[in-house]
């Protein structure tokens, strides 16, 4: 029987890792999740991993409880399922975006930025029956600055993985993890709001949630989605606990993503006066 490397992934963050492995391995198969039904038409929407497989003629299947018989080993990155112990007959390695044992769980990048860490990184480890506790085979530190967005961090990791992939020996050395209780949570929409934050906290949320979110400023029943901010002053700051936040790119209600100042300039004068009173714009 021909043996294959298997990749497990199910969202947009999985794709750069899959692309690197695809460009380096001849015998590759992919396991992903089934399409979700969404929209008014209740149409099935494939995830980005399935789309990449179709575009590049990569064989793929949907996850079920039976491990593939032709698997040599697997690599998982941002996969929506937790593997039961019965599935781990062959070794499966996970790419986790923190320096384990710190920041186990689903949101290590976002949590590190929110906690204003100066360093994080990524870990490749052998999956065991617990969550993010397996033996480590590779780690790489990555600096985080006060200007680092989550998207920047993901890009740093993807570039490093691409550069070092051919030199990573998954079976060369296994390092047991220290026992540290350091877990992250799955964020919900309420976590994205910045209304009650001070300036530092708001900036951290905008940087942390620009992939999973984005951050949100709530105005009555309307949500202004915030993709980025600038430290350069302009005429349309938002006031947070007496401090001025200068937005850069936003998605206003019912509109496409756009430059924030262009959006403000496009408001009619009368609406502008009402809007600034409601959400504390300082025009």
Which residues fall in each region the model found?
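Glycine/alanine-rich phosphate-binding loops at beta-alpha junctions
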Residues: 2-23, 32, 40-55
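Donor/substrate-binding cores of folate-linked one-carbon enzymes
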Residues: 2-4, 20-23, 72-190
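Short internal beta-strands
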Residues: 28-36
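Hydrophobic beta-strand scaffold residues
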Residues: 59-60, 92
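Short acidic low-complexity segments
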Residues: 60-70
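Internal anion-binding site segments
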Residues: 178-283
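A generic structural signal for well-ordered alpha-helical segments
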Residues: 52-53, 117, 210
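Short beta->alpha connector loops
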Residues: 10-13, 64-66, 78-82, 229-232
